[in-house]
């Protein structure tokens, strides 16, 4: 009828207590009722360019299984980010061609080939770092090939995870660098442990999503 959802097994409420009805898309929940637990490994060079994506279930031990293919083969180094529903892979290195600006995405809960999301706004970017939350994916730093002086970049760029489209400019790191590995909370990203042209850098940069 038109009475709306019914909760079975609840007969009375004591005082001001009650139950919290689940809300939001069921895409945010695993089919078995557990927590989010899938990892996806993509791309590589062996020595040719690889488009393979494998997946693992983090809660259990075992070999990876085939998930699907990237839009084209390339080496991807620490340039993946994810929300609860999507995984994005941005940039990478193509043997014989150079760096890639492509962004691919997949739906984590289902296997299948990657879809085109858009492009990074720096066409020759690799060895960059990334941070992400449920809303934004952010890439920062990178090595420019061919390695013109200084061969690294300080650019920060972002995408909105739930949409598709090219990356937009977010801002700049405090200096040019590559390998700016990132960690994040739901509200803040931190980049540290970077390498400049010479020598390595101990600088730590923070940003708010």
Spell out what each predicted region is:
Residues 1-209:
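Polar, enzyme-active/binding microenvironments
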């Amino acid at each position: 009828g038109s009475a709306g959802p019914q909760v079975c097994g609840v007969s009375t409420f004591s005082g001001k207590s009650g139950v919290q009805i689940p809300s939001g898309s069921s895409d945010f929940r695993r089919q078995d009722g557990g927590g989010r637990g899938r990892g996806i490994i993509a791309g590589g060079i062996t020595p040719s360019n690889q488009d393979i994506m494998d997946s693992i279930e983090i809660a259990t031990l075992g070999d990876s299984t085939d998930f699907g293919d990237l839009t084209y083969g390339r080496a991807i180094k620490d340039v993946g980010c994810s929300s609860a529903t999507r995984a994005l892979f941005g940039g990478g290195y193509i043997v014989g061609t150079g760096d890639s600006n492509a962004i691919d995405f997949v739906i984590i809960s289902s296997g299948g080939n990657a879809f085109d999301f858009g492009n990074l706004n720096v066409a020759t970017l690799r060895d960059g770092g990334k941070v992400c939350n449920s809303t934004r994916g952010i890439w920062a730093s990178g090595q420019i090939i061919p390695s013109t002086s200084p061969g690294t970049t300080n650019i920060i760029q972002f995408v909105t995870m739930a949409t598709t489209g090219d990356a937009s400019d977010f801002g700049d790191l405090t200096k040019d660098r590559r390998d700016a590995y990132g960690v994040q909370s739901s509200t803040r990203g931190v980049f540290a442990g970077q390498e400049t042209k010479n020598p390595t850098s101990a600088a730590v940069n923070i940003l708010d999503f």
